From Swiss-Prot:
Its EC number is 4.1.1.37. Pfam families: URO-D. This is Uroporphyrinogen decarboxylase. PANTHER family: METHYLTETRAHYDROFOLATE:HOMOCYSTEINE METHYLTRANSFERASE RELATED, UROPORPHYRINOGEN DECARBOXYLASE. Its main location: cytoplasm. The lineage of its organism: Bacteria, Pseudomonadati, Pseudomonadota, Alphaproteobacteria, Sphingomonadales.
């Protein structure tokens, strides 16, 4: 289905710096386990990776929340660790424990891995299928993990709140760790570029572990590589917005916004929207930042939280979203209530 011009696609227009009232809405992890149609499909297909690498299944999952809720944006169903899988690490998902990568890069280098770039091809197939089926007014978002966050998994093999293993490697072997970051900048730029060529309208960089770094390290391992990525994507694809989501960055958000060149900044639920409005560059699009637990809880508490966010960004382009991914136990009715509240 042919996409409409940006001015008739609310989300794309706002990501390009326009303000719309009401703001466009999409939710991180909007395609997933809280939806009964997702659970039914997963029962027929096996594990998460089997779904992610099945272009037909992944396209269907991407489209499910659009059909049910009419979100203004569809986000590709995939995972941030697809890139290290293509770079030669083994990727598996352990029930109740999250993703695991091996061999780890604690004492190894990228030269020890054997890349398998063909692993990325089904992702581009998913993009093409979604693009063909997506409603014309809906913006299509691609995504990747940011280099720092992906590197934490490549080094330690799994996520952890403090990322101690990866931070130790960065302190002890900064040149070796820089090589990992540089390789991820290259791989991520190519990956997102091919998503754009296949049909996405904008892309988001998920930096889930950005909050684990001290200011100087944040500058080197989050801001600098993100800025490189954004420059490359803007040069290759003028007019395609890039959203940066440095979860946990807190007081480092203004520097991130100024120095990376992203077109929009995602706010996690710990950020005071009024503070963000006062301290982020004027006119920069912001995205967020409802607490996912407020959505789970519902009721008047949800209404109050939604209203506070809607009133926090006078005159600023705003995309309504969560502060992190939607939770498994989120009732469908609460998502419907959220949309009704935002859209009036």
């Amino acid at each position: 289905m042919a996409a409409l011009p940006a001015e008739t696609r609310p989300l794309l227009a706002v990501l390009r710096g326009e303000r719309r009232d009401p703001p466009p809405v999409w939710l991180m992890r909007q395609a997933g386990r809280y939806l009964p149609e997702y659970r039914a499909l997963r029962e027929t297909k096996g594990g998460f990776l089997e779904l992610a690498y099945d272009s037909d299944a992944a396209a269907e999952i991407t489209l499910q929340p659009i059909r049910r809720f009419g979100f203004d944006g569809a986000i590709l169903f995939s995972d941030i660790l697809i890139i290290p899988h293509a770079m030669g690490q083994d990727l598996r998902f352990e029930a109740g424990e999250g993703p695991r990568l091996s061999p780890t890069l604690v004492d190894r280098t990228l030269a020890d891995l054997e890349p398998v770039p063909a692993r990325l091809e089904p992702i581009y197939g998913t993009v093409r299928r979604v693009r063909a089926a997506l409603p014309a007014e809906t913006t299509f978002l691609g995504f990747a993990g940011s280099p720092w966050t992906v590197a934490t998994y490549m080094v330690a093999g799994q996520g952890s709140r403090e990322q101690a293993e990866t931070r130790r490697k960065a302190y002890r072997d900064p040149a070796g760790f820089q090589a990992i970051i540089d390789a991820l900048v290259d791989a991520t730029a190519d990956y997102l570029s091919k998503q754009i060529e296949a049909g996405v309208d904008a892309v988001q960089l998920f930096d889930s572990w950005a909050g684990s770094l001290a200011p100087r390290e944040f500058e080197r391992w989050v801001i600098a590589p993100t800025a490189q990525l954004v420059r490359r994507l803007h040069a290759r694809h003028p007019g395609v917005p890039v959203i940066g989501f440095p979860k946990g960055a807190g007081g480092k958000l203004p520097a991130y916004a100024r120095e990376t060149g992203v077109d929009a900044v995602g706010l996690d639920e710990t950020v005071d929207p009024a503070w963000a409005h006062a301290n982020l560059p004027e006119g920069l699009t912001v995205q967020g930042n409802l607490d996912p637990l407020a959505l789970v809880s519902g009721g008047e508490g949800l209404d109050t939280a939604v209203d506070a966010i809607l009133g926090a960004f006078p005159g600023r382009p705003h995309v309504f979203n969560l502060g992190h991914g939607i939770l498994l136990d989120t009732p469908i009715a609460h998502v419907e209530r959220l949309l009704a509240r935002v859209r009036g």
